Amino acid sequence: MVTFFKNAKKFLDLKSAHEEYHALHYKEGRVYASSASVLVWLDEEFGKRGSYDFVTGEKADVRMPEFEKVIPPVDARAVHVVLESDELAKLCVVLKSIAAIAAKVPEVTSVRLHWDPMGLQVETEAHNHVSVTYAATGRVHGYTPDMDIRACAHTKHLADLIGYFHQRGTDLRIYAPLRVSNQSPLYFAADGTGSVLGQVYDAEIRQD
């Protein structure tokens, strides 16, 4: 629980005109933190319902988003990779390093993800500046050789999520998008917690 609240500010947007992104939302044994691009939740019985301002802790008069509608309906057959804590630690370092570079090289503010038989490939490139490729090794489920599964994510948002899940010290399941060509959201799941991350537009992937 402490890990969630310590990281929650990273997943909100306190500067947004949409006040629902300033609040933590409690509903049916779950607390949500969200922005326009990121949704993270924790399963726990908190004994309260409704929305509460993150800064003041006071009840917020905002409309609670319908979070259930944006969570991808994955099942046991869905393609996903399971990363253990030590691999998450390495991936977190890589993503934070890329995010630091992005402050000077805007072309690397996003990274491409590619699911393969060994795990998850993470890569980014800025012509004449930098090229980074990292293979996160994990247990792959649901993948077949004929699949070409790619996605594009905001580097800092992904780094923040991976950092959060690593701090929890459990395995993380990273699901492939259910509709690759539509760049549907990415789904992350661990014991008692999960997240949804919207993709960054990529003309080479999107075909709608």
Where are these regions (language model features)?
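DNA polymerase processivity clamps
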Residues: 1-208
